[in-house]
Amino acid sequence: MPTFYESRQLVTPGDLLAEGKYIAGDNTYKENDKIYATRVGLVNYERRKIHVTALKAFYVPRVGDLVVGKVAEIGTGGWMVDINAPHLAVLRASDVLDRPFRPQKNDLVSLFDAGDLLIAKIVAYDRTRDPMLTVREPGLGKVTHGLVVEITPTKIPRIIGRKGSMINMLKRETECRITLGQNGLILINGKTLEDEQIAAMAIRKIEKESHTSGLTDRVTEMVRKEKGGVEHTSKEE
């Protein structure tokens, strides 16, 4: 009676968890003596009973995804980064430095310290190991300024809109540079603090009303109203 995942391993809907005389618990179902997951979460085995602890707001990494993460730990050969996933991601020093990494000579803290925000790309992930990151591409690396907004990762496609209509409107109307992390973290860089805050308000509105029609027009109207009624403060003051 085999099981196909280790306890506390991440599973997704439709994954075959076990086969044989097991009992289907929370977020699982049984069909033809096989137990499958119905939710994204962590699988648990309690003797003959199998259940999945759902992870509602967590992000499931995919190779190629752009993410915004926070450095959680510094190791001997790199950093552990919180990307809003069930497990921390790994950023190796060799994926940052343009020379061979030498622990005795290279001070990792001088590059990225705990608490630093990073824009990175996922280069490896297969659910049997922690996600691997890189920052060795244009536009990636340490975040030095801007406003970060966190939303439910599954709402990112709504922020983008059909053929990029929503995100392009936001950038145009708020005059902000907006970096969308597929993990639900969004970096906003504007000319003024007010512009960044207006962009953040718009993103929150999209997240809250993502199921409604006519949203692009309503968000556009809100942004224009807010932009027309505030005094702008330079970010350098």
Task: Describe every region a protein language model picked out.
Residues M1-I119, V123-E237:
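Single-stranded RNA-binding regions, centering on S1/OB-family and related RNA-binding modules
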